[in-house]
């Protein structure tokens, strides 16, 4: 059923990081799918020149989505020339100045908005806080997207509302504390990313966070890449506590990707096919594009994988044998494959031989694993990943947690810990329970986006009816 007979225009502006770009592009696909019977929506994506090739390639199946590049600012202190996304930053310590620099896009963004058809609503990343100012100038309702789930948001809100960790000396970084609004959940101070340790940089990070919070509270709502059935108590908490903008679950957005066409199989798929034929389950190992793992820790991971005797496919940008020394590749030749190229993670997780995923628990990766029914071995490293891991392991029980020696998030993980937890996930009773649970959540995930009846589909319906009708009544152009 069509929301309106008028033609509507939606603007998407993702942050310059693949983990943030992809979900918003998938949301653009979902918008068009929602209106495929009677195309009454157009979608425009804003980005910068160095990010446009990736976006255009990702959307090659969806030429209806228009992509506009804005010139990325030059001569930013500490940022190498030509760096336009966080994956290319020499260090994540440059994240705050990089994010601050995006505000220099604002005048170009607003000049371009003047030339476009009337915008029905905008979805922009929370790190692009300044887009709320642009939205207000043009009287455009703005939704904010942070790329996190409702669980992490709700727990964070409760912790900061009750000021659990405001006094530096009040709790050690690793002392468990009960979350007042969720008494079954215990968190540690180190579960919350405090930015950097340098005072000036911490101050800059705090200032950026305050700007984000201010812009978020003036937004029309949150778009959450999740589904209600996965975390209903936390969605309800977020929508019932105070005057914050309403959050809307519209995922899992990874399920909007089109089926792969018959292109040539890469070597890693041939290897997985072989393992399937041999009846050998495979552990997929990947930590995203921004995890900073020391060579010492990488060596320990390699030895832990080797000791576990489990078959594994490990995707890493580093030359493992160069770090560990000659002989490692020969020793794991039958059981392991190391890939240093870009891979299609969804295709790997969907492969019948893959029975576990050792992950940093970035939300995109965790949710993909849930959607295909693969349990997780959670090893969080930064940002809200510790909360994602807590949700995966303790709340919905679809995974096992890797523990550091000192109990902190960024502490060292031994080969014995890794080997033991790998075997527990792949062969143990906890792994069997996680595998059973994740299969059930996988079914729920697919049901959430069923046309007409899914919870996320209905949420999108409500958003479009509310915003598009209200823009019609205010004289929005067709």
Swiss-Prot record:
Its EC number(s): 2.4.1.-
Disulfide bond annotation, renumbered to this chain: none
CDD domains: GT1_Gtf-like (cd03784)
Annotated residues for binding of UDP-alpha-D-glucose: 289, 343-345, 360-368, 382-385
Enzyme class at the top of the EC tree: transferase
InterPro entries: Tudor, UDP_glucos_trans, UDP_glycos_trans_CS
Name of the encoding gene: UGT90A1
Molecular-function GO terms, alphabetical: glucosyltransferase activity; UDP-glycosyltransferase activity
Organism: Arabidopsis thaliana
Protein name: UDP-glycosyltransferase 90A1
